[in-house]
Amino acid sequence: MKILYSQRRFYHVEMPFNNRIEFAGRSIESTGYAWWAGNARLINVSGKLLGAHVAHAGLIVFWTGAMTLFEVAHFLPEKPLYEQGCILLPHLATLGWGVGPTGEIIDTYPYFVIGVLHLVSSAVLGFGGLYHSLIGPEILEESYPFFGYDWRDKNKMTTILGIHLILLGIGAFLLVIKAMFFGGVYDTWAPGGGDVRYINNPTLNPLVIFGYLLKSPFGGDGWIISVNNMEDLIGGHIWIGLICIGGGIWHILTKPFGWARRAFVWSGEAYLSYSLAALSLMGFIACIYVWYNNTAYPSEFYGPTGPEASQAQAFTFLVRDQRLGENVASAQGPTGLGKYLMRSPSGEVIFGGETMRFWDLRAPWLEPLRGPNGLDLNKIKNDIQPWQERRAAEYMTHAPLGSINSVGGVATEINSFNYVSPRSWLTTSHFVLGFFLFVAHLWHAGRARAAAAGFEKGINRENEPVLSMKLID
């Protein structure tokens, strides 16, 4: 196979000690990359690159299985998941495994089985990675033409893209099948405080599903993050599955149009940069989704959202003071605004005090108390249920802040510095990883464009100006 870049052209760029370092027969002279460039050394050996990716998948699946078993071994049934530092069991609980009414974990055996299945899968992937790295053919196209590829073969690259899209579509439909036919999923909006149920009537109306994409990302609109019912969520996965599978078939059967051939850089590093950009975007969206959405990420498992904890505090003190005889409808706070209840500028009745900024919160424990124009005073005076009080009191002291004392008006327990919400972990990790993936996209995109334009990679250290300068002393 013709090599896109001269392999020896750039090896002088590295420091001299790299010239003598060789891993698996791949030195800087033979590949154009130093040992620390990792898989870049495997750009032109598709079989070994496959081995690296399969082994990487094995490591990921091994961590998932081992960490799941670790969380199962440390699980305490008397405490909620979010108070135990669990970051994997909440996902499994959301899928409806081992969960009862109100989000109570009633059976951890499914989690044990899932953890073991992941460990077994990781062993298979690990063996495959070792085989393709050490024993299998170096170049797939010589032994298995169907699996071989040339980075510059635009038709083959879009075919591979199509296969990936079909696999993503199948993944979306797996959730749909689980929700509709195999045990259902956990719905935090189910009456009485949440329960596992089948989603029998997913939303298929394109005006509803794609209407989320046309919403403003600000305030109460919330773009796609504003999904607040399981019918829309599962219906969205049906649409995404159809689009991904349809797009995959399209890319397999067609060749890139002329404008696409001219617009994109067609090299291994360019495809890496495109992938990093996509992952970065998904990371940033997931970050905001986890932080604000309590439908896809139920508060019973992930802990309350920040706005939810704040509104829960206002609600808890309203309940307390109302029992002590306070008229919560007319009481004034220190600023002259309503202490417990007030009207928003549009006239909607909302909680007063510092939590007024979170007026757009929607939560299962609060919605039964709303009327046609915000919070219903009659319901607040006569229809607050014990389960709503208990849940609000719990959420009030478990805000995803990691703070020792009150921040933003949210009360915390005196030992709350020991509590870090899984919602905080997920949000922060997705933001940080999304940021670094974006930086990596810029890095690799710049390198790919420079290589395509024929620019020099790096500096020729034999002719650096500093070498001809006088010593400092």
Swiss-Prot record:
Propeptide ranges, please?
1-14
Could you name the Gene Ontology cellular component terms for this entry? chloroplast thylakoid membrane; photosystem II
Which amino acid positions bind [CaMn4O5] cluster, per UniProt? E367
Q: Which domain of life is it from?
A: Eukaryota
Q: How does the entry describe its membrane topology?
A: Multi-pass membrane protein
Kindly list the biological process annotations in GO that this record carries: photosynthetic electron transport in photosystem II
- Tell me, what's a Pfam family for it? PSII
Instruction: Could you list this entry's UniProt keywords, alphabetically sorted.
Output: Chlorophyll, Chloroplast, Chromophore, Manganese, Membrane, Metal-binding, Photosynthesis, Photosystem II, Plastid, Thylakoid, Transmembrane, Transmembrane helix
Provide the transmembrane region boundaries. Answer: 69-93, 134-155, 178-200, 255-275, 291-312, 447-471
Give one GO term, molecular function aspect. metal ion binding
Family from the record: Belongs to the PsbB/PsbC family. PsbC subfamily.
The protein's role, per its UniProt record: One of the components of the core complex of photosystem II (PSII). It binds chlorophyll and helps catalyze the primary light-induced photochemical processes of PSII. PSII is a light-driven water:plastoquinone oxidoreductase, using light energy to abstract electrons from H(2)O, generating O(2) and a proton gradient subsequently used for ATP formation.
Subunit structure as annotated in this protein's UniProt entry = PSII is composed of 1 copy each of membrane proteins PsbA, PsbB, PsbC, PsbD, PsbE, PsbF, PsbH, PsbI, PsbJ, PsbK, PsbL, PsbM, PsbT, PsbY, PsbZ, Psb30/Ycf12, at least 3 peripheral proteins of the oxygen-evolving complex and a large number of cofactors. It forms dimeric complexes.
Name this protein carries in UniProt = Photosystem II CP43 reaction center protein
Gene from which this protein is expressed: psbC
